[in-house]
């Protein structure tokens, strides 16, 4: 109605314009520009005003549980009015395979994302949570996300993604979420917040928090440095433990601001808040024969808490649950369809069938394959002699296996030999690895390319 008008667009970033009438966009012929998908305003009674997923990378519930009152007071206060899953376990020991499993409900040997050297995108038949939520009419955004998932297709379905590689601090993420909630308050929003503060890293490359440095005795500041040690194999050093606990405390402090805002601006039935982690960490005493146990209970214990519409209040669930169960649970609560062949299960709390066991596996090419099958009372541990091949398959001909009481996994003299336990665990373990067992058959060229893995054998 006002004719042609000119405006200046911010450089290297998207701008938002509110349209209430038919509008035509023009640009000089030599100035290329991109137009995003329109954001439709309006709420629906079939949706919640806010569904927020908070991904706290590497937050081990087995480690956090004893410190919950002192280091996670805001998280515990908020989710005490919701549900806490006390026996939640990860599908894998680190993020690359564990993250896609959460986003799809499929184990890593089904997503085929487990190899750092191979860029593999999720097949379209495995829609992500954001794709499902987009199909329901939500405005989907990731106010803070990791770039790691982009190439694998994990961020499909989002209308907006603000991603970074390393600096994913809770203080920045919370601010970004609050800004996004305010900006798009006329839409029903599905938001994804990825937090990296808690995740430990090799001290050779990362500085510890000032609070840790200021309080740690000088003697604890001197320790062997090995720049090649990955986070999943960090040693049991006090400096790493104190850094982990301090970052837990700071993450909780910042999330407390977010939770207070939500309680002040939303009714309980207007939101669904989902806080979870992808795996734990082993550096609080998990060693076997001097080596780090990357599938220990602390390493694979994950965090999962929910609050809001459809979530029982004040519930602590002791049923066994897996990170792949998050997908079907959101499907049940939000109303999106779930593939029949996913590995995730709907928890009994929401009308599903309880698990009789949970599975955590390490399928890392060049290293031995490791599996933990856990019940409430026992754990079966499996490890191959052969390393995992580049394609994720492994030879199970020579395998070490044992069944142990929970809390005593791989400890000398603690293996349990009972026919009833053998009859329970062995068929389940065989069924889990059936699709990746190569029965000693392999491509010679593939093995020849990795002589350091296979001793130079063809």
Question: What positions do the PLM features span?
Answer:
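Catalytic domains that recognize anionic headgroups
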Residues: 1-458
